A protein has these predicted regions:
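Acidic (Asp/Glu-rich) sequence patches and key acidic residues
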Residues: 1-109
């Protein structure tokens, strides 16, 4: 299994093609979850079970992703950190683009 982001009720080509891979379930448990627990994060903690994200939620999620990156610098190997950073950057960039419709909902899980 893997964790990714998709848009619900896709209404155009952009939304049809919106798919952001975040992590395999095992990588999430091994590398993301320790950061989430150590930092007491709320939004990213819901990624493994699944969460609906609206446009107003994006700044909070991006802030948590920044905190995870800072934690990873001190706690992960370079290889794992690079892998995580690549996916976080892609997620951050795509979340900023996802809400071309005000009522769009992104599912992360």
């Amino acid at each position: 299994m893997s964790i990714s982001a998709v848009i619900y009720e896709r209404q155009n080509d952009f939304e049809q093609n919106f798919f952001v891979p975040i992590a395999t379930e095992s990588f999430f448990k091994e590398c993301w979850q320790p950061a989430i627990e150590a930092l007491g994060l709320q939004w990213t903690d819901l990624f493994s079970s699944g969460v609906d994200v609206e446009e107003e939620d994006v700044p909070s999620i991006i802030e948590e992703l920044i905190q995870i990156k800072e934690w990873a610098v001190k706690n992960l190997t370079e290889e794992k950190r690079d892998k995580m950073f690549e996916r976080i950057t892609i997620l951050q960039n795509n979340l900023l683009l996802a809400f071309q419709r005000k009522d769009a909902v992104v599912f992360i899980g």
